[in-house]
């Protein structure tokens, strides 16, 4: 796994605006995607993730014009997802300036597309997004966990967290690695928008089950939550939205805090680091 930990702001986009919700529901406006992307890039974000969160549910492609506008104002790696079902969708996203393509619903419905994307664009371009939620109806063949006296397993959800699949998240993570995914974007639906910390049980379980990089997502409300996920799991990157969108914390200040607490992060923007070489 990579030594330097990455901090990744996330732009969840609906109707051309950045939004944020709670458990994938109760969506509210959080700003302009182009302005926020530029701000995060300048503050030293390592990468940016842009997710068109209603594309799959609405059975349409990602808003390409907006992807192009965001790509023009940043100089950091850029992952885009939402509504990717066929290779042409991925090609269009990459041609608009994205460096990586994230696929979730499309991969569950047609797992072979992961291999096809890897063969066509390279493993480094393929990010499989896994949205997982606790299911307390335990059954044979699932990875069972216990917390607060209750047993559960992690179920994969699709269509923006609206539909359960019956897939065990840990087993699905192993499968997507086998099929050729270069990275996993792992989001806890239970923790999404709560601002009370990442799901350490889910994150550690998936990280320990695969060899490819994993990005932790869902629940970050303060810098200490990032510190916790880096100290208590071997996750490669921490993604956050709320703490950055509402200006309670800036990317550079969060990274300074992590550095002060012995987490190896890259300080300074990509542009400023390049200027020093």
Write out the residue ranges for each language-model feature.
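Conserved, mostly hydrophobic/aromatic
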Residues: 12, 40, 48, 80, ...
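Conserved anion-binding
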Residues: 13-15, 19-20, 98-186, 190-191
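Structural preference for beta-strand elements that scaffold enzyme active sites
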Residues: 6-10, 47, 75-79, 100-102, ...
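C-terminal helical cap(s) of enzyme catalytic domains, especially alpha/beta-barrels
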Residues: 113-120, 230-269
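Charged helix-capping and loop-helix junction motifs
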Residues: 61-68, 111, 166-170, 196-204
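Glycine/small-residue-rich loop that forms an oxyanion/phosphate-binding "nest" at active or ligand-binding sites
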Residues: 63-125
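Catalytic cores of alpha/beta
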Residues: 74, 78-100, 201-238
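Glycine-rich, proline-tolerant flexible connector loops at the mouths of alpha/beta enzymes
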Residues: 47-66, 105, 185-196
């Amino acid at each position: 796994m990579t030594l330097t930990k990455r901090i990744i702001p996330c732009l969840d986009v609906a109707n051309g605006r950045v939004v944020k919700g709670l458990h994938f529901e109760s969506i509210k406006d959080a700003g302009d995607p182009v302005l926020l992307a530029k701000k995060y890039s300048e503050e030293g974000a390592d990468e940016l993730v842009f997710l068109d969160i209603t594309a799959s549910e609405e059975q349409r492609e990602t808003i390409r014009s907006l992807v192009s506008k965001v790509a023009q104002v940043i100089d950091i790696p850029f992952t885009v997802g939402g509504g990717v079902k066929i290779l042409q969708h991925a090609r269009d996203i990459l041609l608009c300036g994205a460096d990586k393509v994230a696929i979730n619903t499309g991969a569950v419905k047609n797992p072979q597309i992961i291999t096809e994307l890897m063969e066509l664009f390279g493993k480094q371009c393929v990010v499989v997004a896994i949205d997982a939620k606790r299911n307390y109806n335990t059954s044979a063949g699932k990875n069972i966990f216990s917390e607060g006296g209750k047993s559960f397993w992690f179920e994969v959800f699709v269509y923006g967290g609206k539909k359960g699949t019956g897939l065990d998240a840990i087993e699905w993570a192993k499968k997507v690695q086998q099929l050729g995914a270069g990275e996993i974007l792992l989001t806890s639906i239970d923790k999404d928008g709560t601002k009370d910390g990442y799901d350490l049980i889910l994150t550690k379980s998936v990280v320990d089950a695969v060899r490819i990089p994993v990005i932790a997502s869902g629940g970050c409300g303060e810098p200490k939550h990032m510190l916790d996920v880096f100290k208590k799991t071997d996750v490669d990157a921490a993604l956050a939205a709320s703490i950055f969108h509402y200006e309670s914390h800036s990317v550079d200040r969060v990274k300074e805090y992590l550095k002060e607490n012995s987490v190896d992060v890259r300080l300074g923007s990509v542009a400023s680091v390049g200027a020093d070489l």
